[in-house]
Amino acid sequence: KAAFQKAASEALESVTSDKNASRYANDIAIVTGVSPNSIAAQVVEGLLAGGATVVATSHSFKPSIKAWAKQAYREHATGNAKLWLVPANLSSYRDVDALVDWVGHEQKKTSGATTTILKPAWEPTLFFPFAAPPVHGTLADSGDLFESQARLMLWGVERAIAGFSHIGADTNVQHKLHVVLPGSPNRGVFGGDGAYGEVKSAFDAIVNRARAE
């Protein structure tokens, strides 16, 4: 009887009593470059397990992406965790700006006299810019190829950081955006990987900018 009572008690216990299940409960996290079995996907799953509201972006809305999102939420979400899957081509500055605008503004739907709030305006607290293309090319290929890779992995990231960090700045001076950059010790050591090494080196400059600007 005691065993059954213990099992019933554990079943009724709120997940919010688990510290790990609520460690990100107050966070709005943006994770870019999500695809099944990717590092970004694992980050999303960890955030959901901590109760975060997560905006995950993918350049593709293939059935496999949607299936992953449903499974990730079903298996990992705790408490009031939410997962929004948003299409975005982050090598396009227009898409970067549109994503920032969408996150920072309330989204409504009006039907006749009824207005429904689809999502509130958010002030993101965590940003994981993991979107990246397949990288290839030697120094002899520098030019358009390197530029397209750097646009997604570096310049688009800088633009997004600037956009997200300014959301709510006029009304909440204490608000901070924590950015987790996907760094690497590979600074051109392997060769043949396009603009990868240059981009990873440039992340050091972004960190310095955070202190200086």
Regions found by a protein language model. Name each.
Residues 60-78:
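Glycine-rich phosphate-binding loop and adjoining beta1-alpha1-beta2 segment
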Residues 32, 87, 111-134, 181:
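Rossmann-fold scaffold of SDR-type NAD(P)-dependent oxidoreductases
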Residues 57-62, 90:
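N-terminal Rossmann-fold cofactor-binding loop
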Residues 14-59:
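Canonical Rossmann dinucleotide-binding motif of NAD(H)/NADP(H)-dependent dehydrogenases/reductases
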Residues 1-15:
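Glycine/serine-rich phosphate-binding loop and adjoining beta1-alpha1 elements at the start
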Residues 89-119:
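Conserved Rossmann-fold cofactor-binding substructure of NAD(P)-dependent oxidoreductases
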Residues 20, 131-213:
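Catalytic loop of short-chain dehydrogenase/reductase
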Residues 72-94, 98:
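Rossmann-fold cofactor-recognition segment
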